[in-house]
Design a protein with these regions (language model features):
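The feature captures the conserved acid-bearing segment of alpha/beta-hydrolase catalytic domains
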Residues: 154-158, 162, 168-176, 184-228, ...
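N-terminal cap/lid segment of alpha/beta-hydrolase-fold proteins
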Residues: 19-55
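C-terminal catalytic histidine-bearing segment of alpha/beta-hydrolase fold enzymes
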Residues: 224, 231-264
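Primarily recognizes the serine-hydrolase "nucleophile elbow" in alpha/beta-hydrolase
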Residues: 29, 115-178, 189-190, 194
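Short beta-strand element of the alpha/beta-hydrolase
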Residues: 57-68
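Alpha/beta-hydrolase active-site loop
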Residues: 98-119, 142
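Short amphipathic alpha-helix adjacent to the substrate-entry channel of hydrolases
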Residues: 73-90
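Bacterial Sec-dependent N-terminal signal peptides
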Residues: 1-24
Length: 264
């Protein structure tokens, strides 16, 4: 009976907290410090910031959309709203208008913007999580594991609180393979592969995939290989979760796991 009462109390309290907290969304904020001569960069490299106005020192999720580096647009997932945290949804330049490494450069610039600006809105820059779905998860891993991208912005990738990816590519992204003239089914690990940069001191990483029998391009196996290489290199805080019965589209069931990671 005690446990039932406690559960009811927690539910009522959390609903009451959500109702009392006001949220604001700022749209199309440019994340490069100075406009360049590249018109496409100036048009595309923007982010939306959703944040609680009545709380302080909240965590922030930087969210990169999917689309194979060829399509997609910034969107704040509904499941991340009204959870006492900020969400930064990022647009980045897309193929064929650009090629690698422009996608990664944009992702790093967006993460750098969050580190440099989130405190102005009440957030805690020590609680920044970098997350994404599919190619967005790929970008999350690249800017975290390959330290050179954030180093260009005078930031340490190890300052990221954690990484959660949903159905991410961990080998060289298939669109980049196409840029090389390769078939997308031909595996490649080079400088543009997250697994190439597996290292011991990286932030905590949670890898989530769909069912290995239903996922795209051996996605589960790629994630399993990254986790194995992280462990071999001495990385301690990593998880691999396979969601049975689901294919590539796992955002709806994956985001609750992301929230659980943040709330640990």
């Amino acid at each position: 009976m005690n446990k039932i009462f406690q559960l009811i109390f927690c539910l009522v309290f959390s609903q009451s907290f959500a109702q009392q907290t006001s949220y604001k969304t700022l749209v199309d904020l440019p994340y490069y410090e100075k406009p360049g001569k590249d018109i496409y960069q100036n048009e595309r490299c923007k982010l939306d910031l959703y944040f609680p106005m009545t709380t302080q020192n909240f965590p922030t999720v930087v969210w990169f959309h999917g689309g194979g580096l060829k399509s997609g647009s910034k969107e704040i997932p509904e499941q991340l709203k009204e959870k006492g945290l900020a969400v930064v949804a990022v647009n980045y330049r897309l193929h064929p208008k650009v090629n690698a490494p422009k996608y990664i450069e944009d992702a790093a610039a967006a993460v750098a913007w969050v580190f440099k600006n989130i405190e102005r809105y009440g957030g805690d820059k020590k609680q920044i999580y970098v997350c994404g779905f599919s190619s967005g998860g790929y970008l999350s891993l690249m800017v975290t594991l390959d330290q050179k991208w954030l180093k260009k912005h005078k930031l340490d990738a190890n300052a990221i609180k954690g990484v959660v990816t949903l159905s991410a590519t961990t080998f060289t992204n298939h669109t980049i393979r196409k840029e090389y003239g390769m078939e997308i089914t031909q595996a490649l690990i080079d400088q543009y592969a997250p697994v190439y940069h597996a290292r011991a001191e990286a932030p905590p990483i949670m890898l989530i995939t769909g069912d290995r029998k239903k996922e795209f391009f051996g996605m589960y196996e790629e994630n399993a290989y990254l986790r194995r290489m992280l462990k071999i290199n001495g990385h301690l805080e990593n998880d691999l979760i396979e969601i049975g019965g689901y294919g590539h589209e796992i955002t709806e069931v994956g985001i609750p796991l992301l929230l659980k990671k943040i709330n640990r």
